[in-house]
Amino acid sequence: MTSGDERIKAKKEFILQGFTAKTHCEAIARLFDVPGIQRVIVSVAFVNRSGTELLKHQLKKYAAKTKAFIGIRNDITSTQGAKHLLDLGVSLLLVDTGSRSVLFHPKLYLAKGAEHARLVIGSANFTMGGLNNNIEAGFAIELDLKNSDEKALVEGIEKEFDALTKDYPDHVIPITKAAELDALQATGRLIDEMTTSPPRPASAATSP
């Protein structure tokens, strides 16, 4: 017989940004409605200032509980975006694979409370395009931590990300000062939004 605990099912919402009125920005903002937030994890390939501006109020309120894993050495993540996260008080970890041909690319946003958690996972980076303008797909999932399977899922996510710094100390870089970001920009691992044009997708008309 299945217990009442096990009958509870996670609520899932599909987000098809660009073709519907739903956006990842709105879905991620709702993560912060979880009662009694204890922890927030953000993991993305790319971040820029226009992206962080969209969620700055939520991030500032829960900065002390937020850990952000951000990919670098990808010609998109900017010094300005990373500095904004640092200024907001977020615990910032930059992930450098050491190669431009192998990117840190997971896109995941998690807020965990005492009894509930919310998760957004899909294709959306922490940029204006990823959160609002691009055609993106993802799932927003509400999880009940009284359900053993859903609790295990959330704890598994936490465990995997918590292990990154210990398991890959040469590639996961904790940032505590703006000067560290300036040094990464100087070596080409972060871009300067003031001097770098946004990437343009190749097309039949523009490709050599």
Language model regions located:
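PLD/PLD-like phosphodiesterase catalytic module centered on the HKD motif
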Residues: 1-208
